[in-house]
């Protein structure tokens, strides 16, 4: 309950995005934008032409979505969600 790791994991979906890109255009512009903004790549979905990223602290997720949607080749930007099974 007071576990720092648990607290960190429960808050993480609020600062993670899944970004899909057009495979024919590639992901170079997206990768440069991710690096420029100080984001962390959590997973690279090669079969789906997408990446899961963690935003740096202090960057509003809605502003990040708008930013990444403008990057050349990006097709979709979604908030990452975690669901608990009951």
Feature names for model-found ranges:
Residues 1-9:
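Bacterial Sec-dependent signal peptides at the C-terminal "C-region" and cleavage site
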Residues 9-15, 46-48:
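Short, low-complexity disordered segments enriched in Ser/Pro/Gly and basic
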Residues 17-19, 34, 39-41, 53:
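Hydrophobic beta-strand residues in large extracellular and virion-surface proteins
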Residues 17-28, 57:
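Short, surface-exposed ligand-recognition loops at beta-strand->loop->(often short) alpha-helix junctions
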Residues 27, 31-34, 62-65:
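Extracytoplasmic/secreted envelope proteins and their assembly/folding machinery
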Residues 40-86:
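Autoinhibitory propeptides
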